[in-house]
Amino acid sequence: MAGVKERAVLVLEDGTVYHGYAFGARGKTVGEVVFNTAQTGYQEIMTDPSYHGQIVVMTYPHQGNYGVNVYDMQSNRPWVRGFVAKEFSRVASNPRAQQTIGEFMEFYGVVGIEGIDTRALVRKIREGGVLKGTIAHASLFGAPDHAFTQEELEALRREAQAWTDIDGRDMTPEVSTPLPYAWPTLKSGRRIVVMDFGIKHAIVENLAALGFEVIVVPGKTPAHQIMALEPHGLLISNGPGDPTMPRYAHETIWKLMGLLPTFGICLGHQLLALAAGGRTFKMKFGHRGANHPVKNLQTGKIEITSQNHGYAVDIDSLKDFRPTHVNLNDGTLEGMAHARYPVFSVQYHPEAAPGPHDALYLFRRFLEEVEAFHGATGLPVEKQRADQHGI
């Protein structure tokens, strides 16, 4: 029927139902329901591999008004399981736009829902923690104006409940590059190997902008293969899922500890802590947004940061690391540095994309660590350390 908005529902695993209207690709999807407080940056959010397995609810009510373009992609496709907003724009008011958000979601098969009470949904997640949920469009049941029955809603609830949890699941093989590759750059300076657990383009772009030669390798790459590339530094990337599950990464990172200047971001921060004998825990609803205040314990300055994580490092479990940054909202650990080695990490995203650039200095700090390390030691010492580590 022309002009009729297609009905849709979001059904949570506890039976809560939110009625709204279909948007994006038509169909059904299941995932972990989380929220993001950023006002803009929906394209970067959808294409961030760290959101793999999740249905993202945007707290800012209006999304899509500036459209979508190829330049803001953070990977080669969207990774969200579903996308939720109070209202999506049908037009793209931006000269950079190449598609509307609706066209983008339809092209890539992203199922969405709009018109629900997103404030009530976010309050529920904040108070009770993240839940699994199912988005379903009415056309699956026969007609765009189909009224969902209690039996249909119960079936959708059971589907959400049965969906495989992110907890206890290694998601690296689903998002990591299958083969090593070199990132295009105009310069050829110190060589950095990036362990890819679901990296965003903006991270690699920041490394290349500093003159690094960047080689991206699969997250499962063992230590001896990384060292065979003769890197001057190591970056451990962001990514989705439970940090305790890629145990092969813990072993690799432990073997490389102290051999190379190392920078961990988000999941990479958690993997570093676990490799060093620390602990992580799942947060109630996580940190996802572009406005999280973090205190730099070394300078006393406050940084407004972009964040996207559902797990955190237990600050009391650190052994060879010292805290360098803490979250001002809940006191959780946001950064750490090794007591002896040029190894440091942050839980947030210094590259932003989307978000503020308060933490871009961390990439230059990494460059300085690399230059200082190789100026003071050189390859023979690295070879000796590698032999000691059995690499």
From Swiss-Prot:
SUPFAM superfamilies: Carbamoyl phosphate synthetase, small subunit N-terminal domain, Class I glutamine amidotransferase-like
Family annotation (CDD domains): GATase1_CPSase
Subunit structure as annotated in this protein's UniProt entry: Composed of two chains; the small (or glutamine) chain promotes the hydrolysis of glutamine to ammonia, which is used by the large (or ammonia) chain to synthesize carbamoyl phosphate. Tetramer of heterodimers (alpha,beta)4.
Pathway: Amino-acid biosynthesis; L-arginine biosynthesis; carbamoyl phosphate from bicarbonate: step 1/1; Pyrimidine metabolism; UMP biosynthesis via de novo pathway; (S)-dihydroorotate from bicarbonate: step 1/3
Keywords assigned by UniProt, alphabetized: Amino-acid biosynthesis, Arginine biosynthesis, ATP-binding, Glutamine amidotransferase, Ligase, Nucleotide-binding, Pyrimidine biosynthesis
UniProt-listed Enzyme Commission number(s): 6.3.5.5
Reactions the enzyme catalyzes: hydrogencarbonate + L-glutamine + 2 ATP + H2O = carbamoyl phosphate + L-glutamate + 2 ADP + phosphate + 2 H(+)
Catalytic residues as annotated in Swiss-Prot or TrEMBL: C266 (nucleophile), H349, E351
Glutamine amidotransferase type-1 domain mapped to chain residues: 191-376
Gene3D superfamilies linked: 3.40.50.880, Carbamoyl-phosphate synthase small subunit, N-terminal domain
Positions of region (CPSase): 1-187
Organism of this sequence: Thermus thermophilus (strain ATCC 27634 / DSM 579 / HB8)
Record-given protein name: Carbamoyl phosphate synthase small chain
Family: Belongs to the CarA family.
InterPro entries (UniProt xref): Anth_synth/Amidotransfase, CarbamoylP_synth_ssu, CarbamoylP_synth_ssu_N, CarbP_synth_ssu_N_sf, Class_I_gatase-like, CPSase_GATase1, GATASE
